[in-house]
């Protein structure tokens, strides 16, 4: 696996509150290797060891870079309010699929059902764009518009997804535990933020970090998005090189 330098600094992580964890009473003992000893708690909360965070975040960046260079597809999941906007922006910048409103149970494990819903969603979007809904009786048009609105909310971020994702990035494993369990069941690799109350053994690769702070979530996503974009550029460059070689 290609290893690169991702410019992850302690000052930036401190400024983004990446190190701030939960109340010491809420911690998961499995997180002990990733947090500072009890004597270094701040106002009754655990503090994440940022040296550990930097190591795992750098590893995650290496992983997504290499995956993107192989043209793998990513799904970013973050349905908590504090994460929704950052997830949307990150997905747009990295050209990834995303879920930032509500995770529908079985979205991945019942993929055939999800595909059916996606086909209906795309069909309704086409009809609306072409003005076909306006030609229908008001009652019928209103029903279809409500259906379209519901599908947009639940499936809008995956409307172009034609197969199961190769990697899933999860912001809060407790909030989106159902999504994580579906990935585990299907064997889809996962990268997850883990706060001091999380289980570090669930995701394929865990990044110890504050998953309740907008600034922390944004910081982690920015690093991962940059790595994904760099990987995609690498893929394009390699593709162009192969074409030039075939020309000679």
UniProtKB/Swiss-Prot annotation:
Keywords: Chloroplast, Plastid, Ribonucleoprotein, Ribosomal protein
Chief place of localization: plastid
CC terms in the record's Gene Ontology section: chloroplast; mitochondrial small ribosomal subunit
GO annotation, biological process: translation
Keyword Plastid: yes
Pfam families: Ribosomal_S2
Subcellular localization, as worded in the UniProt entry: Plastid, Chloroplast
Keyword Ribosomal protein: yes
Alphabetized GO MF terms: structural constituent of ribosome
Domain of life: Eukaryota
Similarity remark: Belongs to the universal ribosomal protein uS2 family.
Name of the protein in its database record: Small ribosomal subunit protein uS2c
Native source organism of the sequence: Trachelium caeruleum (Blue throatwort)
Taxon lineage: Eukaryota, Viridiplantae, Streptophyta, Embryophyta, Tracheophyta
Gene name of the encoded protein: rps2
């Amino acid at each position: 696996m290609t290893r690169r330098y991702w410019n992850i600094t302690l000052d930036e992580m401190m400024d983004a509150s990446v190190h701030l964890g939960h109340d010491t009473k809420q911690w998961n003992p499995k997180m002990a290797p990733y947090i500072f000893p009890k004597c270094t708690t701040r106002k009754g909360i655990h503090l994440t060891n940022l040296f550990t965070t930097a190591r795992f975040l750098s590893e995650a960046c290496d992983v997504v870079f290499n995956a993107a260079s192989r043209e793998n597809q990513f799904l970013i999941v973050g349905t908590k309010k504090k994460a929704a906007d950052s997830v949307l922006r990150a997905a747009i910048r990295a050209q990834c699929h995303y879920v930032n409103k509500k995770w529908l149970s079985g979205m991945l494990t019942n993929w055939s059902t999800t595909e059916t819903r996606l086909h209906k969603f795309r069909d309704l979007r086409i009809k609306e764009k072409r003005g076909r809904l306006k030609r229908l009786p008001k009652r019928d048009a209103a029903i279809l518009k409500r259906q379209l609105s519901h599908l947009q909310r639940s499936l809008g971020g995956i409307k172009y997804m034609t197969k199961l994702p190769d990697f899933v990035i999860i912001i809060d494993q407790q909030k989106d535990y159902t999504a994580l369990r579906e990935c585990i069941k299907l064997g889809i690799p996962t990268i997850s933020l883990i706060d001091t109350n999380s289980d570090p053994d669930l995701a394929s690769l865990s990044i110890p970090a504050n998953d309740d702070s907008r600034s922390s979530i944004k910081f982690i996503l920015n690093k991962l998005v940059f790595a994904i974009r760099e990987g995609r550029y690498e893929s394009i460059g390699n593709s162009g090189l192969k074409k030039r070689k075939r020309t000679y």
